Amino acid sequence: MGLMWGLFSVIIASVAQLSLGFAASHLPPMTHLWDFIAALLAFGLDARILLLGLLGYLLSVFCWYKTLHKLALSKAYALLSMSYVLVWIASMVLPGWEGTFSLKALLGVACIMSGLMLIFLPMTKQRY
């Protein structure tokens, strides 16, 4: 059950991160504070996506809380690294994100996935 809550947390946090990235790239920069505040108060699509991203992080924290009650901390924190993989893949697949593929990033993803496999795959008992 803890693994399920952890996966929910990772997926929700990844979607929230993508939402916040979208909002940050479409809202006026905070260096133009009055324009930024006006865009928030107009509550257009960009501001709504910003709010959804923030609410997504809040929901992700609730799922993370449930995860920590059911799953060992060493496994739970390792699970968070999947968010990097999901966001990287989504940025390349989703239209308008312009995520770039590189061998360096692919090597990083391979390291993350290898580490997760080492942590989560069942260990065989050795007889001496």
Swiss-Prot record:
Membrane keyword on record: yes
Primary localisation category: membrane
Species per Swiss-Prot/TrEMBL record: Escherichia coli (strain 55989 / EAEC)
* Membrane-crossing segments per the record: 3-23, 36-56, 77-97, 101-121
The entry's keywords: Cell inner membrane, Cell membrane, Lipid A biosynthesis, Lipid biosynthesis, Lipid metabolism, Lipopolysaccharide biosynthesis, Membrane, Transmembrane, Transmembrane helix, Transport
- What molecular function terms (GO) are annotated for this protein? carbohydrate derivative transmembrane transporter activity
SUPFAM superfamilies according to UniProt: Multidrug resistance efflux transporter EmrE (SSF103481)
Q: What does this protein do?
A: Translocates 4-amino-4-deoxy-L-arabinose-phosphoundecaprenol (alpha-L-Ara4N-phosphoundecaprenol) from the cytoplasmic to the periplasmic side of the inner membrane.
Q: Record's InterPro entries?
A: Flippase_ArnF, Small_drug/metabolite_transptr
Q: What is this protein called?
A: Probable 4-amino-4-deoxy-L-arabinose-phosphoundecaprenol flippase subunit ArnF
The entry's localization annotation reads: Cell inner membrane
**What membrane topology does this protein have?**
Multi-pass membrane protein
Q: What GO CC annotations are associated with the protein?
A: plasma membrane
Q: Which residues lie on this side of the membrane: Cytoplasmic?
A: 1-2, 57-76, 122-128
Q: Does the keyword Lipoprotein apply?
A: no
Give an example GO biological process: lipid A biosynthetic process
Periplasmic side, ranges: 24-35, 98-100
| Signal sequence annotation | none
Per the UniProt record, the lineage of the source organism begins with: Bacteria, Pseudomonadati, Pseudomonadota, Gammaproteobacteria, Enterobacterales
Subunit field text: Heterodimer of ArnE and ArnF.
What gene codes for this chain?
A: arnF
Residue ranges that the Swiss-Prot or TrEMBL entry lists as coiled coil: none
Q: In which pathway does it act?
A: Bacterial outer membrane biogenesis; lipopolysaccharide biosynthesis
The record's family statement is:
Belongs to the ArnF family.
